[in-house]
Curated annotation (Swiss-Prot):
Involved in cytoplasm to vacuole transport (Cvt), pexophagy, mitophagy and nucleophagy. Works as scaffold proteins that recruit ATG proteins to the pre-autophagosome (PAS), the site of vesicle/autophagosome formation. Keywords: Coiled coil, Merozoite. Possible candidate for an effective malaria vaccine as determined by epitope response in sera. Signal peptide: none annotated. This is Putative autophagy-related protein 11. The gene is ATG11. Residues 1151-1249 are annotated as: Disordered. It comes from Plasmodium falciparum (isolate 3D7). The keyword Coiled coil applies.
Length: 1383
């Protein structure tokens, strides 16, 4: 016998002992070494226990680590992440931890695979041990049968020799009687012969006593051997108990697999949480869009309010302008009055008080008007007084005038002639002088105009350069302003977001701490509940195992009873033979038994008493046997139901496995598709990184350009500073303009208004040009007239010379008029000065542009410091709003000034004399033309800039639209992907529900098994009762035969009353034989009492089983209730986890939005290309889907074929069961028949022995076939496992973690589905269990052969022990290769 090491310490005991053990790298290395040693050594049981301990330590370490990690991360990471670490660092750490966890999971899975291989080896050793035990038992049974046969032979030989001797003695007695009648003389010879016969009988008695002693010694030896065998059986029972403990450990391993399924459930819950995260993100985006729409509506309201205010402001401006217009008209009228008074002021009353003109440009217009009104009132008073004096003088003058009139009339007539001549001469002289002056002034004007043109050209060049720079700087300013505004908005949002996040994080931390404390308490309670549940489950499992043990013991006792019954039958046969011999002896010794009738009657009475006792015992025994038979019938019915249930479950399992394989294939395809998408995302991420690098390069290039621009601007500043030496006063005004950052916008508005004014001036200039053309025609006509007049007046010159002297006085007056004309030229000089001032203003604008460039550099620096000055910027924004309002006021003031300038220009045109109109018109035409040219150029540039800006705006709108469309497409794709994920999650949930249903079905199956075992006990008891009834009937027949023979013997004894002394010796022998029979009857009675006690024990055990069954049902109901409570608590924990994950999502969203805003601009062109590629991929995927549909149809056809095969096998099994039942019926018929005759009985015994040998041979053949089937199943399973190991090695080389996890899951599912750990519970059962294993073997072969497409005959051809060993070596090498690849 092979005795394994102590295997009493189960998997659960190590879990209870090693809860406080920490794990290090050394333990993992020790675990690897122990696995390698186990692969090399077959009987290293200590190392197997060490592996179990290390696995428990790993599980405990992972649980403790996960709890600590969750608690620590919830409390620590949220508080410290803002202080020290960035999001990217945390993300990298999380990725590293995930990689470590994945590596540990792979190592654990490899260890589990190795353990499964070790358990397979162990199971093989156990099978070999069990086979050897069966062989030993069979040998032992054969030895028992042989010993019984050997014992029967010498007894029969001795009996035959005794019969021969008795027959010879009977013949001799008959001869002696004849001689006694004939010859009385021969008495002496008879006495001598009789003495010799006595001596011979004594020798026979001594020999018979020796043989009895030898038989007793043999019986003692057999009893000793039986005790030894019982001890061995007890040892084997203990081993079976150890194996049951191992089965418990295997069940715990199954619980570990269930825990893995729970982990998969948790992963599904994580996916659900991710879906909820996406939903929350969409909701947040929806809320943000709502907020933006509300802000838009608010801005629209504000704009409408501003528009209304602007309208009101415009109405006020119009009112003010009207008032100013009235005031200006009033001032003009006053000024006209003053001029009139001044012209008529002969005594110069007003020269000291009134100036030449109102200074409208001054700020004190209203004060001047009041002064002028006061002067006018005083002058009017003086005029009234002067008028009174004049009236008095007029009266005196009228008298003198009458006298003078008469004289004047005479002088008038004379003067008329002279005046005509004077006028002509003066006109000619004036024309000559004017022509000379005009020529000189033209030359001077042309020089001045040439110089001004040159200056204007230079100024235009400078202005164009500055405008180009200005436009570029303005464009930059706009970009920077936009960036500033965007940054300010983002910073404000960030502040609000950070504050909100801080509040939410603090609240979340408080809530999470409370929830963690509650969860810890709940976990403690759950752990206590789970420990109680595990203890109760252990007790239930122990009770079930005890039931199974009791069943095995009952079956063994049943076999022992059958063997003892056979032994009793053999003894009964020997007793019958002996009784027949004694009857013959009675016939021979009838004459000797007459004296012993009294003794025989007394002994017959004793026998009758014994028979009554035996009948009572038999009745009790019959009742017990009937109960046992009832139990046996019920047990048979339960077994049949169980077989039918198992067959249906196998069918369902077969179909579910096929469907599961199909779903696994679909999952693999979806996983591959997901990996492709991940690969594409990684590719996009790499491209984005490249684009970011290019952006950085371009930014550096732009910075270099900005530096060059700064250098150029510094050079320009140095050149301009040289020019600014003479313009120190204007620099003071620049300091005011520096603070006004939005002057450029105001200038544009002013330019638009100036354009309108210029258009008006252009219209006026066109009118003036028409007037100048008319005047030029008049001048030519006058020139012609002058030439004609000159010819006529040459003759009259002589006469004019005389009149020259009289005209000198008039020339003096003309000089005064010329002085007045010179005053008008001074006014022209003032206009030229204004032009120069405008040029200076342009220069100041140029300087402002340079300063703005400097300010841009300052702004760039400020942008880097804006994170620390966010609150100050808010205040600045408020100040900017006030400044904008001030600028608007200044713009309005400037508009008023422009209107005043327009009115002044109109007044200047009125005040000019007719003589200077030609000069002014010419100069104005030239000046206006130049201004128009400048304005047109400026307008063209402005329009070009506007077109450029509009084009840019359109391009930006198009890009934004494209981006929005692309974002929508991406969202659609993400929605599709999420839908697919949801479908996958739903499928996984369906699988989980199916697993739960399967677990409930298993619970129901366990309940049904308990019921079936109860019925099996009843059936066994019924069978036992039936057999005992048959035996009782046989015993009654035997007793009846004995009674009939005794009656015949009594009749014979009455006839033989004349017996001699020879009968005394025979009576002694009979007494000894009767004593021996009494001893045997007492032994049988003791055996019967023992069997009664055993039956009572069985009844008690049955009652205990019923109580345990009730307890198990109650415990199952409690477990169901606790399960529901656990589900509710899991739901609460999931809600808490969701809250934490939503906080993390918000943080992740914020950072993702930042990245997206930067990356969206660059992805536009790339996404267009991707769209085209995706279209192609979609077409390819459609083709693949069509191919997959075809494959699915083919697989469905295969499933139908498999169904037909399964039904055929079921029919075979039914045929086999019918054959078996026929055999049992034949056996019962053979056992039921018995006859009175000895020859027929012996023949039937021989036939029974032959039939028992045939049955034994058949059982032995079935066991060999089972061994071969299990070997073939292992061979096929190892083939499939080697293929999956090849897949794992390839995936490890390619390092695809997701595919590896899928492969490991498949192997675990294959191991659990093949039921390695549950097949060996049924090895010690009867032929029914053999049939179940055979059917399971056939089913597993059929399932595997559907994949490999093999038949049973092909497996028989391929299978051999050498190939099986080769496969084992290959699988071990592949496991070592995987171990090396893992590390």
């Amino acid at each position: 016998m092979v005795i394994l090491g102590d295997e009493k310490e189960s998997y659960t005991s190590y879990c209870d002992k090693n809860n406080d053990i920490l794990i290090s790298k050394q333990k993992i290395e020790d675990l690897k070494k122990s696995i390698e040693n186990l692969l090399n050594d077959k009987n290293a049981h200590y190392e197997l226990n060490h592996i179990k301990r290390s696995l428990n330590e790993l599980d405990i370490y992972t649980k403790n680590k996960s709890d600590l990690f969750n608690n620590y991360n919830l409390n620590e990471s949220l508080n410290d992440s803002y202080k020290d670490k960035t999001f990217e660092e945390l993300k990298s750490q999380l990725i590293k931890q995930k990689n470590l966890n994945s590596c540990l999971s792979l190592k654990l899975k490899s260890i589990h695979i190795k353990l499964n291989n070790l358990f397979l080896k162990k199971n093989e050793f156990e099978k070999t041990i069990n086979n050897k035990i069966k062989e030993i038992e069979l040998q032992f049974l054969i030895i028992q049968n042989v010993t019984h046969e050997n014992k029967g032979i010498p007894i029969s030989k001795e009996l035959k020799e005794q019969e021969k001797h008795l027959q010879n003695s009977h013949e001799n007695v008959a001869i002696y009687d004849t001689h006694e009648i004939e010859n009385n003389d021969k008495k002496k010879l008879y006495t001598n012969f009789h003495n010799e016969e006595k001596d011979h009988l004594k020798c026979l008695l001594e020999e018979y006593s020796k043989t009895l002693e030898i038989y007793k010694m043999g019986k003692i030896q057999l009893e000793f051997e039986l005790k030894c065998c019982k001890e061995k059986l007890n040892e084997e029972i203990e081993k079976n108990n150890n194996y049951n403990n191992k089965m418990k450990s295997y069940e715990i391993h199954i619980d570990v697999v269930k825990n893995e399924n729970c982990k998969n459930l948790e992963e599904l819950n994580d996916l659900k949480l991710q879906l909820e995260k996406t939903k929350s993100e969409n909701n947040q985006n929806y809320v943000k869009n709502k907020i933006l729409n509300d802000e838009k509506n608010n801005l629209d309201k504000i704009n409408n309010d501003l528009k209304i205010k602007i309208k009101n402001f415009k109405t006020l401006l119009n009112d003010a302008q009207n008032k100013e217009y009235i005031l200006n008209n009033f001032t003009q009228k006053i000024f006209n009055i003053i001029t009139y008074l001044k012209n008529n002021d002969e005594h110069n009353f007003l020269n000291d008080k009134i100036h030449n003109k109102l200074d409208i440009n001054q700020d004190q217009i209203y004060v001047q008007t009041e002064l002028y009104i006061d002067i006018i009132s005083s002058s009017i008073r003086n005029l009234i007084n002067f008028k009174k004096t004049l009236e008095e003088r007029n009266v005196e003058l009228e008298k003198v005038t009458h006298e003078m009139k008469e004289l004047r009339k005479e002088l008038i007539l004379k003067k008329k002639n002279y005046e005509e001549l004077r006028l002509k001469l003066n006109h000619l002289e004036c024309v000559e002088r004017d022509s000379v002056k005009i020529n000189s002034e033209k030359e001077k004007g042309e020089k001045v105009i040439y110089e001004l043109k040159e200056k204007l050209d230079n100024d235009e060049k400078i202005i164009n350069d500055l405008k180009k720079k200005n436009s570029y700087q303005v464009y930059k300013m706009k970009d920077y302003e936009k960036r500033e505004n965007n940054l300010i908005n983002e910073i404000n949002k960030l502040k609000l977001f950070i504050e909100e996040n801080k509040m939410t994080v603090e609240r979340g931390n408080e809530m999470n701490n409370k929830k963690l404390e509650e969860m810890k308490q709940k976990n403690k309670e759950l752990i206590n509940n789970l420990n109680d549940i595990s203890d109760e489950l252990k007790n239930c499992i122990e009770q079930v195992n005890s039931v199974s043990r009791n069943m095995a013991n009952v079956e063994k006792e049943k076999e022992n009873i059958i063997n003892e019954l056979q032994i009793l039958r053999m003894k009964n046969d020997t007793m019958r033979k002996r009784i027949s011999k004694f009857v013959e002896q009675e016939k021979v010794l009838k004459f000797k038994l007459y004296t012993l009738n009294n003794d025989i009657f007394s002994k017959n009475e004793k026998l009758n008493d014994m028979q009554k006792k035996l009948n009572d015992v038999n009745e009790k025994y019959k009742n017990i046997v009937e109960c046992l038979n009832n139990y046996k019938t019920e047990h048979k019915e339960q077994i049949e139901k169980k077989i039918e249930r198992i067959n249906t479950l196998k069918q369902n399992y077969y179909y579910l496995k096929k469907e599961y394989d199909l779903k696994n294939k679909e999952l693999e395809k979806n996983i591959e598709h997901g990996k492709k998408l991940e690969h594409e995302l990684s590719h996009c991420y790499e491209e984005n990184q490249k684009l970011n690098e290019e952006i950085k390069r371009r930014n550096s290039f732009i910075k270099n350009k900005d530096r060059k621009i700064d250098l150029l601007t510094n050079i320009e500043n140095e050149l301009l500073k040289k020019k600014e030496i003479n313009n120190i006063k204007l620099m003071e005004k620049q300091n005011v303009i520096k603070n006004n950052e939005q002057l450029l916008k105001d200038i544009k508005d002013e330019n638009e208004k100036m354009n309108e004014h210029v258009n008006k001036l252009q219209n006026e200039l066109i009118k003036r040009e028409l007037q100048n053309k008319c005047i030029s025609k008049d001048i030519e006509f006058c020139k012609k007239e002058k030439e004609d007049k000159i010819k006529n007046l040459e003759d009259d010159l002589l006469e004019k010379k005389k009149c020259i002297e009289n005209l000198k006085d008039e020339l003096i007056n003309i000089k005064k008029k010329m002085e007045d004309k010179m005053h008008m030229t001074n006014e022209m000089d003032l206009l030229s000065n204004k032009v120069e001032e405008l040029n200076r203003i342009n220069k100041t604008y140029e300087k402002n542009i340079v300063e703005l460039n400097n300010e841009l550099d300052v702004i760039k620096k400020k942008l880097n410091d804006e994170e620390f000055l966010k609150e100050e910027e808010k205040k600045k924004n408020i100040d900017m709003v006030y400044k904008i309002k001030e600028y608007e006021i200044q713009i309005k003031e400037k508009e008023n000034e422009i209107d005043s300038l327009k009115k002044n220009e109109q007044n200047l045109h009125v005040l000019k004399n007719e003589e200077l109109n030609e000069k002014e018109i010419i100069l104005k035409n030239k000046y206006d033309k130049e201004i128009n040219m400048i304005i047109e150029q400026y307008n063209k540039k402005i329009q070009e800039e506007k077109d450029m800006l509009n084009n840019k705006i359109k391009s930006m709108d198009q890009t934004h639209k494209n981006q929005i469309e692309e974002m929508q497409e991406e969202n659609k794709k993400e929605l599709k992907r999420l839908k697919n994920v949801c479908d996958m999650n739903l499928q996984s949930q369906i699988l989980i529900k199916e697993n739960e249903k399967h677990m409930q079905e298993k619970v129901e199956e366990y309940k049904n098994l308990l019921k079936q075992k109860d019925q099996e006990l009843k059936n066994i008891i019924q069978e036992y009762d039936e057999r005992i009834e048959i035996q009782n009937k046989e015993m009654e027949d035997i007793v009846n035969d004995c009674e009939e023979k005794l009656k015949q013997a009594k009749i014979n004894n009455k006839k033989l009353t004349t017996a001699t002394n020879m009968a005394n010796n025979n009576n002694m022998l009979m007494d000894e034989n009767l004593k021996e029979k009494d001893k045997k009857i007492n032994d049988l009675m003791k055996d019967m009492e023992k069997k009664k006690e055993e039956i009572n024990k069985l009844v008690e055990e049955k009652s205990k089983l019923e109580h345990s069954h009730v307890k198990i049902q109650n415990e199952m109901s409690l477990l169901v209730e606790q399960n529901e409570k656990l589900k509710e608590e899991m739901g609460l924990s999931r809600i808490a986890i969701k809250d934490m994950e939503e906080i993390k999502k918000d943080m992740e969203k914020y950072e993702e939005e930042k990245k997206k805003n930067e990356e969206e601009r660059k992805k536009n062109e790339e996404e267009r290309k991707k769209n085209e590629e995706e279209r192609k991929k979609n077409e390819e995927e459609k083709k693949k889907n069509e191919e997959e549909r075809k494959k699915n149809e083919e697989e469905k056809k295969k499933l139908e074929k498999d169904k037909h095969q399964f039904e055929e096998e079921k029919e075979r099994m039914e045929i086999y069961e019918h054959q078996k039942e026929d055999r049992k019926r034949k056996d019962k018929k053979k056992k039921g028949h018995s006859s009175d005759k000895e020859e027929k009985y012996n023949k039937k015994e021989k036939t029974k022995e032959k039939s028992s040998n045939i049955l034994f041979d058949e059982e032995y053949i079935i066991q060999l076939e089972e061994l071969r089937d299990t070997g073939e199943n292992c061979f096929i399973y190892l083939k499939s496992l080697s293929k999956e190991l090849d897949v794992i090695i390839n995936k490890l080389k390619s390092k695809d973690d997701a595919l590896l996890n899928d492969a490991f899951n498949k192997i675990n599912l294959a191991i659990t589905s093949w039921n390695i750990f549950n097949e060996e519970n049924k090895e010690g059962d009867n032929i029914t269990t053999v049939e179940n294993t055979a059917t399971e073997g056939n089913i597993t072969i059929d399932e595997n052969t559907t994949e490999v497409e093999m038949n049973n005959e092909e497996v028989y051809k391929i299978f051999s022990v050498e190939k099986y060993d080769m496969l084992k070596k290959e699988v071990g090498e592949k496991v070592e290769c995987i171990q090396k690849l893992i590390g």
